[in-house]
Design a protein with these regions (language model features):
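C-terminal catalytic/acceptor-binding lobe
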Residues: 395, 588-656
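Short, acidic, metal-binding catalytic loop of nucleotide-sugar glycosyltransferases
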Residues: 451-460, 481-483
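A charged, aromatic-enriched C-terminal amphipathic alpha-helix characteristic of glycosyltransferases
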Residues: 388-418
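N-proximal low-complexity "stem/linker" segments adjacent to membrane-targeting elements
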Residues: 413-454
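Short beta-strand-to-loop acidic/aromatic patch adjacent to the donor-nucleotide binding site
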Residues: 511-522
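Nucleotide-sugar donor-binding catalytic core of glycosyltransferases
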Residues: 57-122, 131-142, 146-153, 195-341, ...
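Conserved catalytic core of nucleotide-sugar-dependent glycosyltransferases
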Residues: 525-596
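N-terminal pre-catalytic "stem/leader" segment of glycosyltransferase-like enzymes
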Residues: 12-156, 162-167, 173-179, 183, ...
């Protein structure tokens, strides 16, 4: 094609493009123009540049094939906990809330059609209604949220409950933006609970002093927990666990909540910056693409992959390393997004912009916050590039959640306010009582054992020591007297096996839980608290640590054994980390042997239909001394079971 012909051909193309634009087919012209530019690039770019591009595209394609965020499977419960209290509640709840509250009450879903028959056939303890948009699978769609209006059927329901002297409670989870939409409904109830404590004075104008209380969001450990596989697949990990890097799930508002939009732009731009470094970033848009007022800005659009229903979002929570978060309400001491509690409980870190609520609920060591674009980018980079930092922060957040911010804590508050017997909640949330058992044939290790047990926090401990072939010295007895309120010493003969000695300790135990300690290992202060928390959210017959730190004295090395086994349903955990209900130890006595008693104990638990859960890796160090151990395993073989993380004995490395 000569030069004149090329000019004529190009001119013809321009005329065609002009005609198409006048016809309104601008998008088509852009697509064709892009193709032409790419074709020109392919014909004229140097080979090395095209080859580099192809290699990068192939790598990106492989990454995309390895993890597709929208293909997340529907959520399956990974907890065996089944301790639902007996309080009977008639409820009207949206799906998110129902998934959390249904484990705290014996719930009955009221609808406009069934409420009379349900009241007639049940003896309810309370009526619990939230600021529902859909309510009980759509049965109450838009009926509760009409400003200044009360749904007549709901009015009949509330009246009926009051006639039967059954307390009624309304929970507005949409305060303060939607206060006016729900106040007409809320003021019918005996008590009003609000996610924003700043709104209490407003509600008290309608329901009276003391009848309006704060009730923030929380986590439900049965569905929000860090388990990485299912109980019926021990040792088989979830292949999608933390395969994504950064995620955001929520909405973008162009024309309202300006402070939220400003904060979200900061976090989204930081995520996009890291996405350009080849980190995977996914935006799950709650409002979709239909409304232009809710469309994400152009810089973020390439990362908007769609939306997920809540049952799929529960799975997605476990599939990304970091979620970014903003809060619609930025001045409340108690109102914040659900994900502040739910996502860390699932084992995923959260980066959020700070509000009074986030500062009120979590310390800086438990939740990472960013105040501007600089700290947002640096904090997000640290969370992605430093797993050790990310895991420790998240572990501390989980501990705070298990101790203060579960729906069991919220249900206790509701029950107390309404005058409903709350003994069941209080018993389950009480300080756990643990009998620590240890059999030792080394008098020199008694002070070390006492020190390890005495420094446990947030638990009540009974110590039971089997002295194998010796009696305690007077100094040891004095040390025990000064340290413990409750302890027992069982003197056992040298002819007794280690298994028999441990059974003798179990027989002397008095508390609900039993924990087996070794006399030379390191148990950091939160060890027992964390193990009991793990036992509660997992519902396992036995918990322990398969992923655990160990110090190999001959190499002066601190290693992490089996790191891939953290938070896994399994058939094995380390013997010095056994923790379980006393009933498990009674039903599965140790065999009368001195080696292999731990392995046979675990086999007995599994063969009896029990389940074993390997918890976190923190707050325990197994000691492997130069002078040997009961294990018949060379140091090199031992080191081959994990990775060396530091040199020199360093408790702080294992602490969280």
């Amino acid at each position: 094609m000569n030069l004149d012909t090329r000019k004529k051909f190009s001119l013809k193309k321009l005329k065609t493009a002009g005609r198409l634009i006048r016809q309104g087919r601008f998008n088509y012209v852009l697509i064709v123009a892009k193709r032409q530019i790419v074709a020109f690039y392919r014909r004229n770019a140097p080979y090395w540049l095209i080859n580099l591009e192809r290699r990068f595209a192939a790598r990106s394609s492989r990454q995309e094939e390895s993890f597709k965020p929208l293909l997340t499977p529907p959520f399956k419960v990974r907890s065996l906990t089944r301790n639902k209290p007996k309080i009977r509640a008639a409820v009207i709840l949206d799906d998110f809330s129902l998934a959390c509250w249904e484990h705290e009450f014996q719930v009955t879903l009221l609808t406009p059609n069934n409420w009379r028959s349900e009241i007639a056939s049940n003896q309810f303890d309370l009526l619990f209604v939230e600021s529902a948009w859909q309510g009980n699978n759509g049965a109450w769609s838009t009926r509760l949220s009409q400003p200044g209006q009360v749904d007549p059927v709901l009015h009949e329901i509330v009246t009926a409950f009051k006639e039967f002297d059954i307390p009624t409670a309304f929970w507005n989870k949409e305060d303060p933006p939607h206060f006016k939409q729900f106040i007409a409904t809320a003021k019918m109830f005996d008590f009003v609970f609000t996610t924003d404590s700043n709104m209490i004075p407003e509600y008290e104008k309608y329901v009276g002093s003391g009848h309006a209380l704060a009730l923030p969001f929380a986590a439900q450990p049965i569905i929000h927990n860090p388990a990485r596989n299912l109980p019926d697949t021990p040792g088989v990990p979830d292949p999608r666990w933390h395969q994504g890097d950064i995620a955001f799930a929520g909405s973008y508002f162009k024309n309202k909540f300006p402070e939220r939009r400003f904060q979200l732009d900061i976090l989204l731009k930081s995520a996009v910056t890291l996405a350009n470094e080849n980190f995977k970033f996914s935006i799950f848009s709650r409002t979709g693409f239909a409304d232009p007022n809710n469309r994400f800005p152009s810089y973020a659009k390439p990362y908007v992959i769609g939306s997920l229903q809540y049952e799929y979002m529960l799975s997605a929570n476990k599939e990304h390393k970091v979620f970014i978060n903003v809060n619609t309400v930025t001045d409340s001491p108690t109102m914040c997004a659900r994900r502040i509690f739910e996502v860390p409980a699932c084992g995923t870190a959260v980066l959020t912009m700070p509000t009074p609520a986030t500062k009120n609920f979590f310390s800086d060591s438990e939740l990472v916050t960013a105040t501007d674009s600089t700290t947002a980018l640096s904090s997000l980079s640290i969370l992605l590039k430093s797993p050790a930092m990310r895991d420790r922060v998240n572990h501390r957040a989980q501990r705070k959640i298990w101790s203060e911010h579960t729906y069991r804590h919220r249900a206790l508050k509701v029950a107390k306010a309404l005058g409903i017997p709350s003994d069941e909640y209080e018993r389950q949330l009480a300080v756990p009582r643990v009998s620590v058992i240890c059999s030792t044939n080394r008098p020199s290790q008694i002070p070390h054992l006492i020190e390890q047990v005495a420094r446990q926090v947030n638990v009540e401990v009974q110590l039971i020591i089997a002295t194998h072939g010796f009696e305690l010295s007077q100094s040891h007895k004095l040390l025990l007297d000064r340290t413990f309120v409750d302890y027992k010493v069982v003197v056992t003969d040298t002819s007794m096996s280690l298994g028999d000695c441990l059974n003798a300790c179990v027989n002397e135990s008095l508390f609900d839980y039993v924990a087996k300690f070794d006399d030379d290992d390191i148990y950091l202060p939160h060890y027992l608290e964390d193990q009991i928390n793990t036992l509660k959210f997992s519902g396992a017959s036995m918990v322990g640590k398969q992923a655990a730190y160990a110090f190999v004295e001959s190499r002066n090395a601190l290693m992490l054994r089996r790191p891939e086994r953290e938070h896994m349903w399994t058939n094995f955990v380390a013997g010095p980390t056994f923790v379980g209900p006393r009933a498990t130890f009674v039903a599965n006595p140790f065999q009368s042997r001195t080696t292999g008693e731990d392995t046979e104990f675990l086999r007995s638990v599994v063969n009896g239909g029990g389940h074993i859960y390997s918890g976190d890796r923190f707050n325990f160090i197994q000691m492997r001394h130069k002078n040997g151990h009961t294990w018949q395993l060379a140091d090199d073989d031992f080191l081959a079971q994990g990775t060396v993380e530091s040199f020199g004995f360093n408790e702080a490395h294992a602490e969280a």
